[in-house]
Amino acid sequence: REITDWEKPIYVKIGASRPYYDVKLAVKAGADVIVLDGMQGGTAATQEVFIEHVGIPILSAIPQAVQALQEMGMHRKVQLIVSGGIRNGADVAKAMAMGADAVAIGTAALIALGDNHPRLDAELKKIGSAAGFYDDWQNGRDPAGITTQDPELSKRLDPVEGGRRLANYLRVMVLEAQTMARACGKSHLHNLDPEDLVALTVESAAMARVPLAGTSWIPGSTC
């Protein structure tokens, strides 16, 4: 804060593993914004065992993070941004209803820009992958020319066309989320709350802390 003369907000990004405790630590440290990243993000920039077995899904992490903020009287004061597995407007609406202030995307934006396109299949096979399966964006060899510093690969990205595709994707995502809010009788996306949600399985009801569909039962919380 001193370096920026208190002009820049402090973002703290944490992986979703024990969000109840980690969010409280971030708030006590003075974070303005907490970015909570779930295990379902698309990166391959870590060990396989971490990708498959470390962290929890973002929709099970949000209730814990919100509870921590509420107990500290900081919900909506310290912003909560969630990411990791956010792909469409339904994901956005669910996250907002559970108490997030905003969402962030990564892999979804890359796909919208043109990564993993079928036309790249031959190039992807040369590096041991295939269209729809490439996720080694950290190695700088992205055949789509997006996540690379290689000047030759970078030429493959048409920023105008890519920007148009990304804008279309974001526009549709927003419209989907807004439509879901209206279906719940809400005039604004930020008016969604947990009462607008139910779960279709016992497991998802327990993780998200919302009632099982057709009941008022929240597993582990109410009778």
Write out the residue ranges for each language-model feature.
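Glycine-rich phosphate/ribose-binding loops and adjacent secondary-structure elements
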Residues: 1-150
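C-terminal extensions of enzymes
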Residues: 153-223
